[in-house]
A protein has these predicted regions:
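Polar/charged side chains located within well-ordered beta-strands of beta-rich proteins
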Residues: 2-3, 20, 24, 62, ...
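Conserved catalytic-core motifs of GNAT/GCN5-like acyltransferases
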Residues: 125-126, 141-160
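Conserved GNAT acetyl-CoA-binding A-motif
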Residues: 114-126
């Protein structure tokens, strides 16, 4: 079932962290190598919380879309204003829930919601080697738009493609 959150208060943050656990562990190891793995994970989760509360949800039109199964978050994505449309970011499925079509279900339901609300076009930056994400995006109607990514802050990443959904 699709769940849309327009504020941090509308999210179960602990449940969201279960979806992003793998990425948070990687971020903790990268940004806090001097800490124990548990402390580094807690710091990465706090950084994530701070980003959502102080930056992400401060933008008009920013939202989180989540796919729930039996009341638990299994897949998530963020959307925020970008150029003449929106930027889809952080599409993730909990590692123990992968391979069950949850990302496709989330994207399909969310894109229907976005189209009904007139929230198009939608862009997404995907690492060139991230085949699972490319497959999900392609199956849901995205096409490669550019051979690089230009982020909201203006930085450019040549290791990513920009995909577009109309």
């Amino acid at each position: 079932m699709l769940h849309i959150a327009y504020s941090l208060k509308e999210l179960d943050f602990a449940a969201l962290m279960a979806v992003y656990g793998e990425g948070n562990r990687e971020n903790g190891e990268y940004f806090y190598p001097e800490l124990t793995p548990g402390e580094a994970l807690r710091r990465a989760e706090q950084d994530f919380y701070d980003y959502l509360s102080q930056d992400f949800f401060q933008a008009d039109g920013a939202l989180y879309a989540l796919w729930e199964v039996q009341g638990a978050y299994v897949s998530a994505l963020r959307l925020e204003p970008y150029r003449e449309g929106y930027l889809l970011e952080a599409l993730e499925t909990a590692p123990d829930k992968r391979g069950r079509g949850y990302a496709n279900s989330l994207m399909g339901a969310f894109l229907t919601f976005a189209r009904e609300k007139g929230m198009l076009p939608i862009y997404s930056h995907i690492r060139k080697g991230n085949v699972p994400s490319q497959r999900v995006h392609s199956a849901c109607g995205f096409t490669v738009y550019k051979d690089l990514a230009v982020y909201i802050d203006g930085s450019v990443d040549y290791k990513c493609n920009t995909w577009k959904f109309l």
